[in-house]
């Protein structure tokens, strides 16, 4: 899956489950852009897992600063699941 496809999937998750209507800037703070508090972060994690059919590990969210960080995390999990 390409970065563009992952970014589009994230945009859909944000739109459907976090009521976010804007574009996702790869270099922007994902916490600020999506206005993530602990409950919204949990929603994002669960819906990303469901959408991409991956399993994120406890603590994965701690390495998320930008949207690109989340894209890279999803890509790693997809690659791990493919092995």
Region spans (language model):
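Phosphopantetheine-dependent thiolation modules in NRPS/PKS and related acyl-activating systems
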Residues: 2-36, 40-45, 50-83
